[in-house]
């Protein structure tokens, strides 16, 4: 699959859905993993092209979930901004947002959906000093997921994605087990994001080292690795950038809008979503054997996206790129 949003920036790459389907098919792809956006073109992608749906997410949501609105007011600058971001001031607002996405996934006949299990504030992004633990995020995420899925007749796989912030990181098998054991939904699984896992090791210098590291962490999971049903395939070797970032703790803007912009820029400096170009990535995919493989790459246009997809596809065939 190819990752996409329904925002104009992505949709305008194609004349229409038929053109998007042709683009994917010519590259040997089965379709798209769609991330719906506020203000997106919700009429552009249909069940003809969508294989999976990536649920929308809140980077910093745990304090909101736990009713600690004062903390969020400090994070976002005002209660009005909190209300604007979450759609209100109580849990039902988060549940409403996710239920809308789940219903859309149902209508699109998506085979899987993706859910982030993570929490990070703007300050934590700059400092890498986090207030919440993996346990706290995982327990709250499991509670939220069960409220969303219990009693529903969804048919898709529900895949929980690792990130490099508190929550599911895929570096602590006991935490992966803690999450899976609490989620009731039978068709649950993991969406392994290779780039996100790479960010857990700031010492990685090459793609080959990264492949070895990912395989090592997967092996540590033993039988739990069978829950890895999906993979977001991409790479970013940005440990040096992060080491520099966390030494500049006073560089974070105090104004919310300026801070939000800076966070956005930093995240994409860290998580670059570049294609693998080492043939060793073939071993990674063949070892894990994901049911769903999404080439989750970042680009600024159709031609650039095609070039990057071709590069990663070639590496997967064992070619040096």
What does each model-identified segment do?
Residues 48-49, 128-130, 309-310:
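Short low-complexity, flexible loop/linker segments enriched in glycine and/or proline
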Residues 2, 94-95, 99-100, 106-111, ...:
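Histidine-acidic metal/acid-base catalytic patches
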Residues 10-17, 28-44, 58-63, 92, ...:
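Acidic-and-aromatic substrate-binding clefts and catalytic sites of carbohydrate-active enzymes
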Residues 1-100, 319-321:
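N-terminal pre-domain/capping segments
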Residues 1-9, 30-34, 49-55, 113-115, ...:
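Hydrophobic faces of well-ordered beta-strands that scaffold small-molecule active sites
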Residues 21, 40-45, 98-105, 142-149, ...:
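Generic structural signal for well-ordered alpha-helices
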Residues 62-73, 128-132, 246-252:
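Aromatic- and acidic-residue-enriched segments that line the glycan-binding/catalytic groove
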Residues 87-189:
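Active-site acidic/histidine proton-transfer and metal-coordination neighborhood
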């Amino acid at each position: 699959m190819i990752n996409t949003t329904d925002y104009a920036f992505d949709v305008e790459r194609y004349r229409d859905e038929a053109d998007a389907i042709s683009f994917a098919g010519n590259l040997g792809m089965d379709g798209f993993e769609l991330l719906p956006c506020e203000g997106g073109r919700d009429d552009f992608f249909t069940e003809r092209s969508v294989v999976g749906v990536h649920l929308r997410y809140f980077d910093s949501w745990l304090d909101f979930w736990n009713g600690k609105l004062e903390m969020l007011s400090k994070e976002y600058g005002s209660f009005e901004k909190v209300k604007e971001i979450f759609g209100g001031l109580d849990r039902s607002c988060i549940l409403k947002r996710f239920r809308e996405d789940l219903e859309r996934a149902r209508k699109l006949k998506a085979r899987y959906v993706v859910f982030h299990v993570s929490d990070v504030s703007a300050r934590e992004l700059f400092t890498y000093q986090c207030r919440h633990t993996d346990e706290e995020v995982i327990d709250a995420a499991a509670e939220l997921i069960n409220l969303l899925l219990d009693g529903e007749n969804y048919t898709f796989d529900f895949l929980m994605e690792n990130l490099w912030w508190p929550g599911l990181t895929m570096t602590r098998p006991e935490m992966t087990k803690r999450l899976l054991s609490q989620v009731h939904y039978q068709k649950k699984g993991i969406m392994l994001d290779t780039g996100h896992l790479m960010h857990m090791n700031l010492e990685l210098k090459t793609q080959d080292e990264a492949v070895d590291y990912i395989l090592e962490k997967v092996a540590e999971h033993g039988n739990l690795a069978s829950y890895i049903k999906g993979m977001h395939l991409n790479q970013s070797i940005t440990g040096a950038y992060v080491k520099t970032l966390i030494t500049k703790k006073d560089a974070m803007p105090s104004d919310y809008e300026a801070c939000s912009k800076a966070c956005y820029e930093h995240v994409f400096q860290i998580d670059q979503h570049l294609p693998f170009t080492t043939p060793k990535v073939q071993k990674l995919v063949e070892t894990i054997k994901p049911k769903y493989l999404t080439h989750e790459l970042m680009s600024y246009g159709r031609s650039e996206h095609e070039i990057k997809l071709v590069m990663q596809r070639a590496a997967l065939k064992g070619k040096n790129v």
